Amino acid sequence: MSADAPRADADVAVDAVTAGPTEPSEPAPTTEPRAGWWDRVRGWPWWVHVLLVWAASRLFVAGAFVWTATVQEANVWTGANPSYQEFVGLFYDAGWYRQVAESGYPAELPRDEQGLVQQNPWAFFPLFPMLVRAIMTLTGGTWVVLAPTVALLLSAAAVLVVHEAVRHGAPRAVAARPGLPLATVALVCAFPTAAVLQVAYTESAALLLVAASLLLLVRRRYGWAALVVVALGFTRAVALPMAAVVVVHAGVRWWRSRRGEDTFGRRDAAGLVGLAAAAGISGVAWPAICGWVTGVPDGYLQTQEAWRGVREVVPFSGWTYVPAFWFGEWGTPVMVAGFALTAAVMLVPAAWRLGPELHTWSAAYVVYILAVIEPGSSLARFLLLAFPLAAVTAGVVPRPAWARRVWFGAVLVLMLGLQVLWVRQMWQFNPQGDWPP
């Protein structure tokens, strides 16, 4: 060691003493960036995100309704240029639901001179109008005000449950894309016929109950699921395909238990048998009640025939003549292309990434409505309840991230445009004759 080293250390010490106290140094600038407004928004609870998407979509649709009402002619429900509440509370099937709420169901089916059953309220299920009637009784409010408001609030609850149904029912897809539940909600809200979620129709209640049934089934709350399915059976004629979902769920649980990946005891089996029975009974309960009250065992089917171009209800029969009515010689190619597109959506990898319950519901429900309806102007509205297909659509392009965003944005813009077109073309009523939305 150099002899100068101790001296150098001493010099440093002396300098430090003679220099006096040092001035406090300025705090070092933080290197952590402040959170921007978008980061703060992303940190909000999931349900706030869902309700923001829902609120924005409902305001958008309300604007489309208000715009369309300005060109609405006088009609059987209102005068020209109806108010927003009249426009969404009285037109088309809303008028029938109002009749149910205010007058109930007839004890005798109306018939024409040939004895054929005419259009009547028995075609419209009771849960939604009776709920509104109860609120009318409690508050003294009118149908025009309360029915669209109840539907709007039910739609808010529905999208919250849709989010959770996707989160719990498609774990593999959500693990790969955590934003999938919210993307699903956005596409459901933007679906071309989602405007009905704020009119006096049953779509809001039905969407809530379908999503709740699937969520409870996935979470294995079979008793609660049975109660919800019973309510669904008195909301829309869509409880029967839920039985197929229950069977698939039971089969998957049994198979996994055989492989040691799950448990499946007698209590589980009994709960699922009861749930399947509830779905089956709920699917026929309202037609049975109609037959019992009117004294006509097939009164519900005869009532449905009154809305069809051909007076018969035979599974899939409508597809033999309706496409030609709408598209002429192009009817068959259009029908085949539509079926092919539907099958493709069910079979793409994004569909298989859904859980078995969501995947089965989409397939069973679509097959069911294709079997029982006469394909027409209401078909697109019925597809709204196949909400897991929105998750499939959002997940078609998984990566890269920029391509996924471009795809989602393009689909969203297209759907919103079609939504405005649907309101303008389908909800606006032509007094000289029109098709129901």
How should these model regions be labeled?
Residues 175, 213-224, 397:
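Membrane-interface transmembrane helices that cradle and orient dolichyl/undecaprenyl
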Residues 276-280, 399-428, 436:
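Signature aromatic-anchored transmembrane alpha helix within multi-pass, membrane-resident enzymes
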Residues 142-145, 162-190, 208, 360:
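Transmembrane-helix signature of polytopic, membrane-embedded enzymes
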Residues 150-153, 168, 183-215, 224, ...:
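Multi-pass, polyprenyl lipid-linked donor-dependent membrane glycosyltransferases
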Residues 116-122, 126, 130, 138-160, ...:
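Loop-to-helix entry region of an early transmembrane alpha helix in multi-pass inner-membrane enzymes
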Residues 57-73, 243-342, 346-349, 355-362, ...:
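Membrane-lumen/periplasm interface segments of specific transmembrane helices
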Residues 134, 146-171, 344-349:
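Transmembrane-helix motifs of polytopic, lipid-linked glycan transferases
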Residues 92-110, 114-140, 314-318:
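Short hydrophobic/aromatic helix or loop-helix immediately within or flanking a transmembrane segment
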